[in-house]
Amino acid sequence: MKETRRKRILLTGGGTGGHLFPAIAAAQQFCREYPGAEVLFVGTKRKMDAETLERYGFKGVAINSYGLKGKNMRELVKALLVLPISCLQALFILARFRPDLVLGVGGYVTGPVVAMAKLCRRPTLIHEQNSVPGLANRKLAKLVDRVCVSLPASASCFPADKVVFTGNPVRENLVALAAKAREVKEGVTLLVLGGSQGARSLNRLIVEAFVGVGSESLAGINLIHQTGTKDLAWVKQAYGDAGRDVWVEPFFKDMDAVYSQADILVSRAGATTLAELATLGKPVILVPYPFAADNHQQKNAEYYVQGGGALLFKESELTAPQLVEAVISIATNREQRERMEFNQRRLAPTDAAGKIVAVCRQLINRDEL
């Protein structure tokens, strides 16, 4: 009979908030269902990942790892040379932590960690957030025990007998925020999110829309603008020169406060942001990042547009006057806004974190037989 001990789950992935936040949501649910569970994140050396994990009370370690896709020859050689080191580091972490299960959430760091976990005969599963799977998850699907998917379109990319449709998990603080009654406030507030890396072209469009020719029609709309670090200074100056009072930050750490203020959003189409907006019932104007791998942001966006919760524009075709018109059409038409809010909530993932942990439980129980 095996000795009873606290369950241990190792999660791996990261490099963007889109990978990290679903992992945090799954970890939170795992700790609820397994009181006293030990959780370890294995990720990249990105400072923002470490700060985010610390804010949510989780421990993380980093390994040396580089992406393979879309690299020039020099970068590709570097990534391949580092890969054996990544695998050795992963083996060392696995030997020390001895997890009951390993969950990969995508990103290049996932590859060596999940592959080594399989070599160590640990139960493994991956979670895919996007409509078009990333390279790491496509390759790992052949090795792992289960594949959890967020959007229906990605299911066909994986072995059918391994796929479980779970949806994309949302952090518990945002689920709690969605359950709160909305405050009655003056005016309409637009929130602009360019993704965790910011978005220069999107920033330019927003600034032109709010301070350029024709911006008078947006005078009654409050604006909150996440710029990313590189564009912060000039965006702030542009609003200041125009006498526009705008809440501008490179990144928002307290997304609860920001989301609670927002009535409408302009955003990229990362899968995790979309799941959060659907949970909160926020109408959104989507401008997918045109250089996303396999055009996955466009595919993500189409799911929410078809469901009636979003409007969609290609960055290459969108002009500031068109953006102004789209914002005004939602801001001034309460019926349309409420319809989009309803549709967003209808598209929201239902207990995605619980479904992922249910799969974890099945694999752990099977391994203990």
From Swiss-Prot:
InterPro entries associated with the record: GlcNAc_MurG (IPR006009), Glyco_trans_28_C (IPR007235), GlycoTrans_28_N (IPR004276)
Keyword Transferase: yes
GO molecular function term, any single one: undecaprenyldiphospho-muramoylpentapeptide beta-N-acetylglucosaminyltransferase activity
Enzyme class: transferase
EC number: 2.4.1.227
Membrane topology: Peripheral membrane protein
Alphabetically ordered keywords of this record: Cell cycle, Cell division, Cell inner membrane, Cell membrane, Cell shape, Cell wall biogenesis/degradation, Glycosyltransferase, Membrane, Peptidoglycan synthesis, Transferase
GO annotation, cellular component aspect: plasma membrane
Subcellular localization, as worded in the UniProt entry: Cell inner membrane
A GO BP annotation: peptidoglycan biosynthetic process
Recorded catalytic activity of this chain's protein: di-trans,octa-cis-undecaprenyl diphospho-N-acetyl-alpha-D-muramoyl-L-alanyl-D-glutamyl-meso-2,6-diaminopimeloyl-D-alanyl-D-alanine + UDP-N-acetyl-alpha-D-glucosamine = di-trans,octa-cis-undecaprenyl diphospho-[N-acetyl-alpha-D-glucosaminyl-(1->4)]-N-acetyl-alpha-D-muramoyl-L-alanyl-D-glutamyl-meso-2,6-diaminopimeloyl-D-alanyl-D-alanine + UDP + H(+)
Pathway: Cell wall biogenesis; peptidoglycan biosynthesis
Pfam families: Glyco_tran_28_C, Glyco_transf_28
Entry superkingdom: Bacteria
Transmembrane segments: none
Record-listed UDP-N-acetyl-alpha-D-glucosamine binding positions: 16-18, 130, 171, 196, 297
Predominant location category: membrane
Family classification: Belongs to the glycosyltransferase 28 family. MurG subfamily.
Function statement: Cell wall formation. Catalyzes the transfer of a GlcNAc subunit on undecaprenyl-pyrophosphoryl-MurNAc-pentapeptide (lipid intermediate I) to form undecaprenyl-pyrophosphoryl-MurNAc-(pentapeptide)GlcNAc (lipid intermediate II).
Name of the protein in question: UDP-N-acetylglucosamine--N-acetylmuramyl-(pentapeptide) pyrophosphoryl-undecaprenol N-acetylglucosamine transferase
Taxonomic source organism: Desulfotalea psychrophila (strain LSv54 / DSM 12343)
